[in-house]
Amino acid sequence: MIEKIWSGESPLWRLLLPLSWLYGLVSGAIRLCYKLKLKRAWRAPVPVVVVGNLTAGGNGKTPVVVWLVEQLQQRGIRVGVVSRGYGGKAESYPLLLSADTTTAQAGDEPVLIYQRTGAPVAVSPVRSDAVKAILAQHPDVQIIVTDDGLQHYRLARDVEIVVVDGVRRFGNGWWLPAGPMRERAGRLKSVDAVIVNGGVPRSGEIPMHLLPGQAVNLRTGMRCDVAQLEHVVAMAGIGHPPRFFATLKMCGVQPEKCVPLADHQSLNHADVSALVSAGQTLVMTEKDAVKCRAFAEENWWYLPVDAQLSGDEPAKLLAQLTSLASGN
């Protein structure tokens, strides 16, 4: 229902317009206060790169963060990552992730990023505290990438990158809750890079698509082509589950059942195992896998995806960030 409201297919969005105007007024006032320096943002001693959205979730932001961190690491840059840690609840903040940190403590995305990149990752509702925690333990970090946080103006930033769903774009264009917008589309004019996931990019935008890898068994780590798996039940607890189901079909998999879950939904063995019957195979997103690995069954697999950026602009962006991190 919410997708139909936000896309404009349902007329119910008009009933929510008063709340949207209020949201836009408050969020705009907050940004203006920081722009006029009526409120002071904290500036880190190292460059900060924000990777965020203009819309609510499901745009492919986390794969972009992983891509960015890995690309900078390959260039010899020491990177730290900070996040709000949505869906997690730590005993105290800031929380610096370790091999023992769970998604219940830190949230799905931070654990996934930590496991994929090995970079120092810290979470806190106050992102400046997370930055300070990383720099206290890893003083050699040269640049901070913040996963989400475009609207978190309390943290000053040197580079802003926005990830856009190229198929859904901005829906009906309205602020939450009548539409999907955290900020209006005009905000794109003031950011440093716009990365478009799928669809047809517009002038000045960087094209991106998600490239699926081999399926990985949660229990054994064994890998195989996902098309080799039989009697598949697909599960996705991400911002836009249909994208994952479409990816499976693109890989030659016709799921017997597709199970969309809420983003950041907590999972347990009983609920997940109930999704599959004898002889069926469960295939989930990598984001779900970080929550299920501790209690996984032998017939549970996940499909990792990597961001693939096209054109000349990614190299220019990476050169800019490498120069920033190196102090040039």
UniProtKB/Swiss-Prot annotation:
Pathway: Glycolipid biosynthesis; lipid IV(A) biosynthesis; lipid IV(A) from (3R)-3-hydroxytetradecanoyl-[acyl-carrier-protein] and UDP-N-acetyl-alpha-D-glucosamine: step 6/6. ATP binds at residues 55-62. One of its GO terms (cellular component) is plasma membrane. It comes from the Bacteria. GO terms for biological process: lipid A biosynthetic process; lipopolysaccharide core region biosynthetic process. Its EC number is 2.7.1.130. HAMAP family: LpxK (MF_00409). Belongs to the LpxK family. This is Tetraacyldisaccharide 4'-kinase.
